[in-house]
Amino acid sequence: MPKRLLCCIFLVLMCVSGCDDAPKPKIGISFGVGEAKRWPAEKGYMEERAQELGMEVETRFNKADAPKTQMQDCFELIDSGISVLILIPRDARKANEILAYAKKKNVKVISYARAVMGEDIDFFVGYDTYRIGQSLGLHLTEKTYKGNLAILKGDKNDFNSPLLYDGAMISIRPLVERGAIHMILDEYVNGWSVDLAKRMLTDAIIKNDYKI
């Protein structure tokens, strides 16, 4: 995600910190993410910008095999005295307890990249995922008019996944209904697992006699 989008987060943080002579806030960042290379890079961008603004940052990465849950990570960050929690949830549907605890402790919550639905979110920074899906689907159908298509929809617990998929299918679905395109794979990938995605795609290709 471009640095200019990350800068939106710090505009919010500056508002939270108040006037120039007010103490700078401590920021907690909780990544409940998979194996994508983007996350360590974005962690670096956030920490670099926070340092430039004189802010203290504590970051937690929470993957599927972590001994602690993301909720535990967030509770510990909140209890450490942060002013703002930047939350990239693994499962946006299970973030309500985190939001409630943050509100109780008067900690502002910024939902980043993955939308969290709830009245206790103070700010969301991300893209219009549905429109991105529309662009992907349109580009695909401009280049491919017929044949076999495999779609991996991402993690079903990420609100971005169905939005991206639904946007893309606006252009793809008519070709499927006409029989021009045949869907040989159309499944979610739990936890955005790279290994699982490889296995699913390999199995689909083999079952379809390597025709894709």
Give a label for each model feature:
Residues 1-6:
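Bacterial N-terminal signal peptides that target proteins for export
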Residues 7-15:
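Bacterial N-terminal signal peptides
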Residues 19-212:
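A residue-level marker of the well-folded mature domains of exported/periplasmic proteins
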